[in-house]
Amino acid sequence: MGKGTPSFGKMNKNYTHIRCPRCGRHAYNVAKGYCAACGYGRSRRLRRYSWMNKKVNRIRIR
């Protein structure tokens, strides 16, 4: 098999994300070694932003 379009079909065989040890979500990137949801592996502090929560009546709820 060459290096063109047919080869790109073989790129989705392995796992990109597994279950995170800290938050339990399916967002731990095996190749990069950190969780996309909570930041485990990249930071000791929990990854948290204000835009993650939904606004109701212009007040951000948790």
Swiss-Prot record:
Pfam families: Ribosomal_L37e. PROSITE patterns: RIBOSOMAL_L37E (PS01077). The lineage of its organism: Archaea, Thermoproteota, Thermoprotei, Desulfurococcales, Pyrodictiaceae. It comes from Hyperthermus butylicus (strain DSM 5456 / JCM 9403 / PLM1-5). The keyword Metal-binding applies. Belongs to the eukaryotic ribosomal protein eL37 family. Signal peptide: none annotated. Binds to the 23S rRNA. Keywords: Metal-binding, Ribonucleoprotein, Ribosomal protein, RNA-binding, rRNA-binding, Zinc, Zinc-finger. Disulfide bonds: none annotated. It comes from the Archaea. Its cofactor is Zn(2+). The gene is rpl37e. This is Large ribosomal subunit protein eL37. Zn(2+) binds at C20, C23, C35, C38. Transmembrane segments: none annotated. One of its GO terms (biological process) is translation.
